[in-house]
């Protein structure tokens, strides 16, 4: 498989201890540079080592959405490089068309509808379904908006509930955010949706960002590790850093933003489950 784009992964220090099984924080940001230069960065913040491995999947792979007859079946149209947490769920990846998908924690997610009989799609393979089937954000939005399947989200091996939302970007700079609210899929689609973190729901994050934009990033920025603060900082810096069509400049620029929103190693706040150490970062030159 010839990948026309680059997927770079920088892993944090190896885990020295296993923290209590509470979930985490993450940040995703898309760099929109000149001459179509698009780079997507992401941090993985988790209170324990998620045992991430990288896999190269070829096009033409037959897949199923869950271990049940009442599921979704497909054959991958695109090869991809994917990151798997605990070797059971795809959290991050890029396909050969340059489409990037990032799965981040969102505890408010509700996938279930009463009496839902649609085919099952496991949350652990939802990201890979997108990477397998779509070359652009437009394609992903058009198909996923039909809501042909229901998401099944079993607990993680450490007992944590799987409550996540998905961000997708493509080489044109287009983006979409997919969230499940009360069993319904809500989609935010457009180049302006460059950043995603965690709680609260995305429309509330945008309202918080609007407040800080009135203040101005050069005047003051929120500095904690909380998801809304990281959202504001990433939104400011991803547009404030130098813009260049040269990947040797653009990629380090995105990595510098990812470092700014990373959580120092060893940080664990028992009463604030969204503050966890950054385990690794990815930067995708699309």
Spans of model-derived segments:
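Catalytic cofactor-binding cores of redox enzymes
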Residues: 146-182
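Hydrophobic helical h-region of N-terminal Sec-dependent signal peptides
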Residues: 12-16
